[in-house]
């Protein structure tokens, strides 16, 4: 599969920038004639993968959403050498289609949870597996792997195009969660079809419950055989990533280029990560790399940034020394040296150029900003490629001779600029591809104040990063009500210098001072800061939000008797925790949307990553259970939930509100029928934001 420059424009269109032509943006439907101004007629088409020979590409349309990331769609193989002739690879919608590196095969899954392979030269389909059912998943994620490991396709082609490795998940022992939906089509609501709710069921392991059993299989494309890899006997937990090492050159005349299968394993508590190398012929695996933390979880996501070099070495990312840094390991898994001994977190790796021996990456120079860097490993010289406060991201061409820089900040929308390599580590600006000046002018015409970043020192002496949006027509001699927005989840960040125009600006336009504070546990401030909330989610975050609110009350333009806190999902949980922990009336009201209310009710992978299992951390679960704090809630409350939420089940809100009733607490509640965790149905989303405004007007 060819690595192209991928450009995500502000309206969400995936396009290609042809590095050789440099001057043009090429739309994914017609790579020879269409420019950025001609995209509107083909917005329904999306590019999935491209073959390394540039002849074929996959496109899909008619997307049918499944869960957060997964979807079924009609996939087409496009032959650029035959006038972009399109061939549908299956007569039914499929998911997670991926093209082999040489463009001769496409692997995908169908609704029966089996894997299939389409042979391009013969235009034929062959079933790779046939044993799947509603509890067996071959090569694709179940709900848990998709939601908490951010992956949908659990398979990978070998670099020689001869084998497909895949993860097999068996959910047979996983408990089932069920919910109902109530709405039929408008015309059918009072017919027989709409008289009875529909029941939906999902295998959903809550904290401490049995997980799916995972195994690794390898399919030989020529012989149509499947082998199961022999994992060590103590391998319990998760297998969220598989890949292959690059082909190595043979040392003898009769040898063929070889590649190892690479398997990432996490134990159940996710505080130990093992990387295995496996021989698909013998099925034997051996340990290549292991990392364990006694104090926290091991960040498996860093594995996605590892760079496997053609000579067998690998650039490993780890936060084992306090910050996310890069290390060079040899082919035997022995550390050779630290590549980036800096006190800042690497946030993304763009890749490694073997010709210049340069590693390109993004790092948090400050927690609120992102800069891009080039590290010449041979010379041990690091160069910052970007300038200016804000967020910088790079998209490189396959030959590492061009990149598109995407820059944005709180005052600058996404601007895309093409750069060209000039040699000796120097880059020259070629042209601004897209500046979104019209969007900037339209935004400025609204007259809304921009975010201002400022520090808050807590009562215990920690310095928290925060931003504020002053009310429209701000007058420093007046006092204003405050709405504190927050998410607060572990490793997350909301205080970032980026172009993120959300609901907070509408609140500022309505006359509120809007503030967001990142407390302990949030990202880009090193391992120890992220460690702070381990085993007791919500407690220290609430301490920080309360301390920040007390500071805001001291400001001359803040009305300390009119303050609110609001959050969604983890932020909703944190809102309830804050209203339960405030010993004095810091906030007069709060809004909790789709909140977790007890970590025993949430899924195993996320919860146990930060809390471990209830069986080993009973005190942590008891001490963060909001049901047990219902009697401590102070201030007015609006609690909101979608009744078809497959992620944070409405069960959380319903059990919690029962506890509030038993404690004699009055509150407001808004339920959205047949809507999920995001409450994305247009009429519901509009209603929700109006409801928030009305609640704040009433209580502040």
Predicted regions and their residues:
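Beta-propeller folds
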Residues: 7-11, 17-396, 401-402, 412
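General helical structural elements
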Residues: 6-7, 374, 524, 695
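Serine-hydrolase catalytic core recognition
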Residues: 241, 248, 254, 258, ...
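Positively charged n-region of N-terminal signal peptides that target proteins for export
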Residues: 1-4
């Amino acid at each position: 599969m060819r690595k192209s420059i991928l450009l995500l424009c502000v309206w969400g269109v995936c396009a290609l920038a042809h590095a050789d032509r440099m001057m043009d943006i090429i739309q994914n439907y017609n790579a020879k004639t269409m420019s950025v101004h001609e995209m509107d007629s083909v917005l329904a088409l999306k590019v999935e993968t491209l073959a390394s020979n540039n002849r074929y590409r996959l496109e899909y349309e008619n997307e049918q959403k499944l869960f957060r990331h997964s979807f079924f769609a009609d996939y087409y193989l496009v032959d650029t050498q035959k006038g972009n002739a399109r061939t549908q690879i299956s007569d039914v919608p499929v998911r997670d289609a991926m093209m082999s590196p040489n463009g001769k095969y496409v692997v995908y899954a169908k609704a029966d949870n089996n894997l299939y392979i389409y042979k391009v030269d013969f235009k034929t389909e062959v079933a790779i597996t046939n044993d799947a059912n509603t509890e067996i998943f071959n090569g694709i994620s179940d709900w848990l792997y998709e939601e908490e490991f951010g992956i949908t396709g659990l398979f990978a082609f070998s670099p020689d195009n001869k084998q497909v490795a895949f993860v097999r998940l068996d959910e047979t022992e996983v408990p089932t969660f069920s919910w109902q939906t109530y709405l039929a089509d408008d015309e059918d609501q009072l017919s027989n079809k709409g008289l009875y709710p529909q029941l939906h069921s999902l295998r959903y392991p809550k904290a401490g419950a049995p997980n799916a059993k995972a195994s690794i299989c390898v399919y030989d494309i020529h012989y149509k055989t499947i082998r199961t890899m022999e994992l060590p006997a103590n391998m319990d937990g998760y297998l969220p990533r598989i890949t292959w090492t690059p082909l190595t050159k043979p040392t003898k005349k009769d040898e063929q280029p070889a590649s190892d299968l690479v398997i990432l394993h996490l134990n159940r508590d996710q505080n130990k990560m093992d990387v295995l190398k496996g021989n698909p012929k013998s099925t034997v695996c051996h340990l290549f790399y292991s990392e364990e933390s006694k104090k926290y979880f091991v960040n498996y996501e860093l594995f996605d940034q590892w760079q496997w070099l053609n000579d067998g070495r690998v650039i490993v990312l780890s936060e084992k020394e306090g910050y996310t840094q890069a290390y060079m390991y040899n082919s035997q898994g022995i550390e050779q040296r630290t590549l980036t001994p800096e006190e800042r977190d690497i946030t993304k790796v763009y890749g490694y150029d073997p010709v210049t021996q340069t590693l390109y990456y993004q790092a948090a120079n400050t927690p609120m900003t992102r800069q891009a860097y080039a590290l010449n490993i041979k010379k041990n010289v690091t160069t910052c490629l970007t300038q200016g406060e804000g967020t910088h991201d790079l998209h490189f061409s396959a030959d590492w001779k061009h990149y598109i820089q995407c820059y944005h900040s709180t005052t600058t929308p996404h601007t895309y600029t093409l750069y060209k390599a000039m040699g000796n580590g120097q880059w020259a600006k070629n042209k601004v591809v897209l500046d979104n000046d019209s969007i900037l002018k339209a935004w400025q015409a609204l007259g809304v104040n921009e975010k201002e970043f400022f520090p808050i020192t807590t009562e215990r002496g920690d310095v928290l990063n925060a931003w504020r949006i002053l009310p429209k027509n701000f007058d420093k001699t007046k006092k204003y009500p405050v709405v504190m927005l927050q998410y607060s989840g572990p490793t997350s960040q909301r205080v970032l210098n980026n172009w993120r125009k959300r609901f907070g600006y509408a609140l500022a336009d309505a006359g509120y001072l809007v503030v967001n504070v990142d407390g302990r546990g949030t990202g880009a401030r090193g391992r120890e800061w992220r460690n702070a909330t381990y085993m007791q989610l919500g407690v220290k975050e609430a301490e920080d939000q309360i301390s920040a609110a007390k500071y805001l009350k001291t400001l001359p333009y803040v009305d300390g008797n009119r303050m609110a806190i609001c959050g969604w999902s983890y932020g909703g949980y944190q809102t309830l925790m804050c209203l339960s922990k405030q010993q004095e009336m810091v906030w007069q009201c709060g809004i909790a949307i789709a909140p977790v209310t007890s970590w025993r009710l949430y899924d195993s992978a996320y919860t146990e990553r930060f809390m471990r299992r209830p069986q080993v951390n009973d005190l942590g679960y008891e001490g963060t259970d909001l049901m047990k704090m219902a009697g401590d809630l102070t201030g007015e409350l609006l609690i909101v939930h979608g009744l078809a939420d497959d992620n944070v089940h409405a069960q959380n809100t319903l059990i919690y509100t029962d506890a509030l009733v038993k404690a004699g607490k009055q509150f407001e509640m808004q339920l959205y029928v047949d809507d999920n965790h995001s409450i994305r149905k247009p009429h519901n989303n509009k209603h929700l934001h109006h409801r928030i405004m009305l609640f704040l007007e009433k209580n502040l």
